[in-house]
A protein has these predicted regions:
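Charge-rich, low-complexity N-terminal segments
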Residues: 1-125
Length: 125
């Protein structure tokens, strides 16, 4: 690979969770408890290794991602330390922080609410 090229690999995941935004005024739809089907993608970048010609073993990625997703799945996000204000942006930061040490080469975490057509992407650099 050349200096101008970078190889990226991604792993998708999903979780179901509820949240609310207590800082919104009464009557605002987000102030009430509501839930979403969330989807996410983690992206790693690097050079394929000589041993297996991959950037990172997808099984290892899946294992790390599943561990973090399980902390979110079927939970009230507001009750999770660090997600007291559980916006898409905050969820992306939460996931990134918990995977950063486990997945060398992590460059981005994307969190989506597909039914709403919304997403937030936290990208290194």
């Amino acid at each position: 690979m050349t200096d101008q090229m970078r190889l990226e690999i991604s792993k998708d995941f999903a979780f179901e969770a509820a949240h609310y935004f207590e800082h919104e005024p009464e009557g605002h739809p987000f102030s009430r408890l509501h839930g979403h089907s969330f989807a996410g993608t983690v992206t790693l970048a690097g050079e394929p290794n000589a041993h297996a010609a991959w950037v990172k073993d997808f099984w290892k990625i899946e294992t790390a991602v599943k561990e973090v997703a399980e902390t979110l799945d079927h939970r009230l996000l507001n009750e999770i330390e660090g997600l007291e204000k559980p916006s898409l942006e905050a969820i992306a930061a939460y996931v990134f922080a918990r995977l950063d040490d486990k997945l060398p080469g992590l460059v981005a975490v994307e969190i989506r609410r597909p039914s709403c057509g919304e997403k937030a992407v936290l990208r290194r650099g």
